[in-house]
Amino acid sequence: MEVLARFSGRSGEITIFEEPATGARLYYEAGVYQSYVLSGGKAGLAYVRLMARVLSGGSDVLLFGCGGGALASELHAGGARVLVTDDNAISFEIARRYFWMPHAVGCSVTDMASFLVTRSATYPAIGVDVGGPCFDYDAVLDEGTCALLRRRLAPDGVIAVNIACDSAEDSTPQRIATRLRAQDLDVWLCEDAPATREHNAVLVAHDGRARDDDITAIADTLGFHAHRIA
């Protein structure tokens, strides 16, 4: 691995690596790999590709969490207008300079809760990919935040939420899925198949059943097991 840059981040040192053989780049922060992006900006992680496929039907997409910007880049390339919010301004600089995120992708320096409270616009597609070292998903995606996400969702819209799990027994995705289900949304839990010790779970929530066949097909194609939350 070749080191391209180092930054001082709020959670610790940020290092950008490049694989000499492939040109793919990694975003490493305080001992945690945050992003893996293929040369040119395409998503290198299956969960990001899953989120991109699920959200791709929206003409306007709101994303929380920047990282390497691969999700925003994929959706922008598909013709969507994309707005990314992140409370760490350096994330946008890193995504554009080192991970090929287009300048046409809109950026807003704010945290998710503040954005949801202060904005009134609705969006047909909302993606949540926030996290980092010692991140508390239960605190950030509490009942109030899930209710606000629902309010910002346009009719027939879809929400995709990524949760990085520490173990196969991690029950965080189920708890947050239950909170979204309480907002009168149909919720699917998509997990790595089979779930490994450290894995990603993607929650997909929408307000009608027309998407269900698409969700299961996309999950199967990318190696995820999807089941509906009752």
Q: What positions do the PLM features span?
A:
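Residues at alpha-helix termini
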Residues: 78, 98-99, 183, 222, ...
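Short, structurally constrained coil/turn elements
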Residues: 10, 101-103, 183
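SAM/dcSAM-binding transferase cores
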Residues: 1-41, 46-49, 53, 178, ...
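The AdoMet/dcAdoMet-binding core of the Class I SAM-like
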Residues: 6, 21, 42-158, 167-177, ...
